[in-house]
């Protein structure tokens, strides 16, 4: 379970106010001196009781505007001294950026972020000149929920402690290869209504596939920090599987095969997972991560900002570079009133789950965009489908393994990459960007490669990952070897 490490953040609002007063020059000091003399002169007391001057009102207004902007919108003085600007830029370059990958939860729609990951990995190979480049080489932290959690384990899990097991193309292919075994040919809703249980056969298939993929690997066998959520029925609360916690104690180290099953154990689709840590001390009865955290971006950002042990030089969101991959807003053609007014509880089950998950994910997107403020466009990228011309869509598209649904989702994935990127705007809803999602991913790949190259020339390492000692028998006897890890 992930424990947040809190540390007070020093505000710079006071410095901004002092800078503004200083810009006003000696006027403020002269006024203060004159006021002191007036208090020693009884004839001046009436003057002190007069209404404030227009200049004083203006100064007060500007000061309070700075304070308001700082604490509400992350304001920074827009006109610092030129020399200080150069120094600040140099220091920021030395700090570098922590690169974060976040993947939303979902079912068959996981084909969409899988295709985006495949394109990004291709772009990384092209821009770096390294044909063996992998997603894990360029990201410092990865978080995934549901199918996104499985993708995270696939891209960052390692058998040799050096290279990841899977390529980005393996993610979406995992879904297309195993769809019928996981969801069955008849469709989950029909099976539930006919037999009363739609999850036994899918659970057996998921357990088999995860065991084949990860064997006895645990959270310690991931190359970088990973965060994968589930909902723990035992404690009635979210449970966040974390590599950082696993390296601290075996009581928080779990097998990756069980972690993946836990985060994807959507009620009614797959059975809950009863699991325990490798030392048997921590127990959990898990259902899907989407119930607790359909969009884990905020959890990943919080992990970095409060983890000074592994990310010692991070000062704020301006030191982050975040890619968040969503499942897409595709249900824009359904739900006519005359139709849904006749629905019973069984008809609402799947649509309600989709609305809840997508709504929660969108809320996190809005909140994260607000947190980044003025550096949103340069430090935070959200990629997901924004509608599609290939519908109409069924509320059961996440659990429909049919060839027609798979082919449609493959087409939507290609359409998504060509669509204009959509950004969340502070208090302003959504804004269509000039760049397409293809172009955004190309730009991001360039930034990731540049950050990777700069780390070799910095005075101090940007990250200081606690390392796990790899053992040939894949068991979990690990220790902190005190190594400061530069990027692979």
UniProtKB/Swiss-Prot annotation:
It holds the Pfam family Patatin. Residues 32-47 have a biased composition (Polar residues). Disruption phenotype: Increased length of leaves, petioles, hypocotyls, primary roots and root hairs. Changes in lipid levels and composition. GO terms for biological process: galactolipid metabolic process; lipid catabolic process; phospholipid metabolic process; response to other organism. GO terms for cellular component: plasma membrane. Residues 23-49 are annotated as: Disordered. It is a peripheral membrane protein. GO terms for molecular function: fatty acyl-CoA hydrolase activity; phospholipase activity. Highly expressed in roots and at lower levels in leaves, stems, flowers and siliques. The active site is at 145 (nucleophile). It comes from the Eukaryota. Keywords: Cell membrane, Growth regulation, Hydrolase, Lipid degradation, Lipid metabolism, Membrane. Induction: By the fungal pathogen B.cinerea and an avirulent strain of P.syringae pv tomato. It is found in: Cell membrane. A motif (GXGXXG) lies at residues 105-110. Residues 101-301 form the PNPLA domain. Its EC number is 3.1.1.-. PANTHER family: PATATIN-LIKE PROTEIN 6, PATATIN-LIKE PROTEIN 7. The nitrogen atoms of the two glycine residues in the GGXR motif define the oxyanion hole, and stabilize the oxyanion that forms during the nucleophilic attack by the catalytic serine during substrate cleavage. Plants over-expressing PLP7 have decreased cellulose content and mechanical strength. Possesses non-specific lipolytic acyl hydrolase (LAH) activity. Catalyzes the hydrolysis of the galactolipids monogalactosyldiacylglycerol (MGDG) and digalactosyldiacylglycerol (DGDG), and the phoshpolipids phosphatidylcholine (PC), phosphatidylethanolamine (PE), phosphatidylglycerol (PG), phosphatidic acid (PA), phosphatidylserine (PS). Favors the release of fatty acid at the sn-2 position for PC. Possesses acyl-CoA thioesterase activity. Belongs to the patatin family. This is Patatin-like protein 7. It comes from Arabidopsis thaliana (Mouse-ear cress).
């Amino acid at each position: 379970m992930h424990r947040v490490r809190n540390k007070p953040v020093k505000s710079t609002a006071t410095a901004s106010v002092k800078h503004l007063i200083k810009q006003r020059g000696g006027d403020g000091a002269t006024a203060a001196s004159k006021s002191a003399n007036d208090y020693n002169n009884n004839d001046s007391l009436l003057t002190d009781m007069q209404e404030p001057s227009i200049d004083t009102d203006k100064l007060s207004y500007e000061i309070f505007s700075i304070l308001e902007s700082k604490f509400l919108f992350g304001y920074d003085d827009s006109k610092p001294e030129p020399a200080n600007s150069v120094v600040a830029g140099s220091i920021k370059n030395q700090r570098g950026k922590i690169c974060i990958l976040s993947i939303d939860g979902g079912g068959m729609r996981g084909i969409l972020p899988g295709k985006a990951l495949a394109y990004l990995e291709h772009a990384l190979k092209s821009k770096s000149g390294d044909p063996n480049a992998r997603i894990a080489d360029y990201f410092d932290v990865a978080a995934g929920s549901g199918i996104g959690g499985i993708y995270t384990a696939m891209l960052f899990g390692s058998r040799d402690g050096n290279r990841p097991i899977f390529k980005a193309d393996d993610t979406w292919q995992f879904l297309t290869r195993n769809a019928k075994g996981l969801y069955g040919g008849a469709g989950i809703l029909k099976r539930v209504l006919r037999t009363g249980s739609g999850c036994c056969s899918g659970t057996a298939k998921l357990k088999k596939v995860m065991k084949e993929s990860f064997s006895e690997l645990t959270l310690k066998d991931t190359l970088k920090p990973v965060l994968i959520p589930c909902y723990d029925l035992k404690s009635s609360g979210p449970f966040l599987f974390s590599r950082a916690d696993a390296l601290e104690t075996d009581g928080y180290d779990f097998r990756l095969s069980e972690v993946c099953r836990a985060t994807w154990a959507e009620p009614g689709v797959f059975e809950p997972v009863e699991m325990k840590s490798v030392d048997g001390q921590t127990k959990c009865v898990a259902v899907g991560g989407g119930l607790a955290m359909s969009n884990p971006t905020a959890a990943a950002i919080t992990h970095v900002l409060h983890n000074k042990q592994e990310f010692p030089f991070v000062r704020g969101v301006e030191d982050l570079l975040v890619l968040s991959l969503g499942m897409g807003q595709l249900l824009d053609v359904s739900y006519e009133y005359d139709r849904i007014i006749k629905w019973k509880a069984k008809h609402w089950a799947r649509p309600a789950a989709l609305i809840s998950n997508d709504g929660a994910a969108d809320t996190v997107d809005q909140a994260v965009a607000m947190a980044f403020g003025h550096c949103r466009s340069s430090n935070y990228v959200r990629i997901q489908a924004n509608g599609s011309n290939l519908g109409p869509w069924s509320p059961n598209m996440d659990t429909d393994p049919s060839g027609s649904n798979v082919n449609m989702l493959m087409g939507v994935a290609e359409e998504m990459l060509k669509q204009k990127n959509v950004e969340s705007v502070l208090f302003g809803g959504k804004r269509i960007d000039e760049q397409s999602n293809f172009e955004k991913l190309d730009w991001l790949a360039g930034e990731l490669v540049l950050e990777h190259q700069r780390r070799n020339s910095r005075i101090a390492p940007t990250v200081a990952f606690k390392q796990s000692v790899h053992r040939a028998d894949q068991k979990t006897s690990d220790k902190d070897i005190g190594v400061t890890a530069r990027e692979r």
